[in-house]
Amino acid sequence: MTTNYVLVETCALVQNRFGMRAIKVFQEDIVPVLRIEWIDKAVHHAAMQVVIAAPRKKLSLVDCVSYETMRLLGVTTAFTLDKHFKEQGFICLPA
């Protein structure tokens, strides 16, 4: 499971590092097997409020949207190397 916000962030990263051919592979081979949660106005607003209220500048809107979505769906484990997910109480893989 992922969100459309993560897809946007991933596409930008893949395009920047690997080019358009990699974007095509990502879109055709990886995206179809993902469960995508499309973020609505309420989740976006809740995540944005966390970003604005946070005392640190390294907290991204995409991460906050992920936290909010995971909590709403009861997801407890994240595939991530981002330490912030562990700080938020999620189980991170790889450990």
Where are these regions (language model features)?
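PIN-domain endoribonuclease scaffold, especially VapC-family toxins
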Residues: M1-R56, E68, E87-C92
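Histidine- and aromatic-rich ligand-binding microenvironments
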Residues: T2, L59-S60, D82, P94-A95
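Acidic active-site catalytic centers that drive phospho-/nucleotidyl reactions
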Residues: E9, D63, D82
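Acidic, metal-associated active-site segment
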Residues: S60-T76
